[in-house]
Amino acid sequence: MEKSWFNLMFSKGELEYRSGLNKAMDSIENEKTTISKDRFIYDMDKNFYGWGERSSYYNNVDLLVSSKDIRNFISDDTFFVRDSNKNSYSIYFDIKKKKFEINNDLSDLEFFFYSYSYCSSSYLNNRSKSDNDPHYDPYIKDTKYNCNNHINSCIDSYFRSHICIDSHFLSDSNNSNESYIYNFICSESGKIRESKNYKIRTNRNRNNLMSSKDFDITKNYNQLWIQCDNCYGLMYKKVEMNVCEECGHYLKMTSSERIELSIDPGTWNPMDEDMVSTDPIKFHSGEEPYKNRIDSAQKTTGLTDAVQTGIGQLNGIPTALGVMDFKFMGGSMGSVVGEKITRLIEYATNQCLPLILVCSSGGARMQEGSLSLMQMAKISSVLCNYQSSKKLFYISILTSPTTGGVTASFGMLGDIIIAEPYAYIAFAGKRVIEQTLKKAVPEGSQAAESLLRKGLLDAIVPRNPLKGVVSELFQLHAFFPLNKNEIK
């Protein structure tokens, strides 16, 4: 049997194939193809995933000299691949004997691979569109994107027709013959372990296969990923400081995440955690009672209301901190939010502590009527005493979104007003303005960058240096870290 070697890139996520062999595999003729030296493909930077019991994931080839030749490439029985750890393997298909083998002893092939890898890479770099390539397909542009799509399609067609790796092997058949393949099982750690006696069988019972929990395995990991609001890309939920790795968009942070970002570990002491709303005006809408919405938000966020307040150390400097949480009913300001912030400011006044309020709110909470509006005046009053009478230092940090009554009260009363990049800051939202005034709101006019140019903000600071910037501002206003004797 003639063998041809070439290099593929594999990574999780592009094409999904459920391992299994066609019941009628004996009828498939064996294909033989040779590959000319000037049409080899190499580039193994990506991960390689072995065939598992249920599914395997293969990525497309990165680049070809001629897209048309992929049908010849994938028709061969042996594939030469390399994983992200630079380990080389050969994947061997024997259609006639129904074998599937992976060999990781390729020392004799290394020189062969590297010699042609260098030649082909040079050829790819020097080749221009004006060359008369006899293998050029006029319907496929010589771009990485189109080439990948074409190769994906070819690989998909080959495996579907020759190994029947889709719904074909799930269907019932009168043929009771069971197909077996020997497999190398890839462990979770990514290391390949040999299992000579391990077999994968095509099952004729569709219900047994479809009832497997493996088909719903992704449901168990929904909480691990988050989607960017701007580019819609998926990323690990614990991405550093909730900043999109692709486009740099700032994602929303919970109040607990912001406290962890700002306060030194082990120094946070929360205040008034047991304060909850009692539906003071017995608000009830046709959709859902206010009390039910409060209960639902508490279960979802683990908070009692839309703000966390407390005392902690920021780079060793004792600080009074209040952080609003947009996930709790849009960060709306009700009587509990107003009372907790008021008590925090009063405590900071008595203890002569610097104050930070991190704003993220849709405004006053309509379910509490005039009681929520009253919080604006109450907070502004205690802030006046804190700033004017005691001459203490208050930093307001505006995040996206900060709107309504929060913007009209303590959000814009800081001695220093800092905003995050691209933060949406306004009193009335764009839709409300356009429907009320019947005028279009210019794009970006309510963004932090626009407000900075108009003098409404003092600075726009990214999340990474924010803690250091605030610490320096505190020291400029004579708030210094505690010495070792004062730290308990």
UniProtKB/Swiss-Prot annotation:
Its main location: plastid. GO terms for biological process: fatty acid biosynthetic process; malonyl-CoA biosynthetic process. GO terms for molecular function: acetyl-CoA carboxylase activity; ATP binding; carboxyl- or carbamoyltransferase activity; zinc ion binding. InterPro entries: AcCoA_carboxyl_beta (IPR034733), Acetyl_CoA_COase_Trfase_b_su (IPR000438), ClpP/crotonase-like_dom_sf (IPR029045), COA_CT_N (IPR011762). Pfam families: Carboxyl_trans. A zinc finger (C4-type) spans 228-247. Binds 1 zinc ion per subunit. Belongs to the AccD/PCCB family. This is Acetyl-coenzyme A carboxylase carboxyl transferase subunit beta, chloroplastic. It comes from Arabis hirsuta (Hairy rock-cress). The gene is accD.
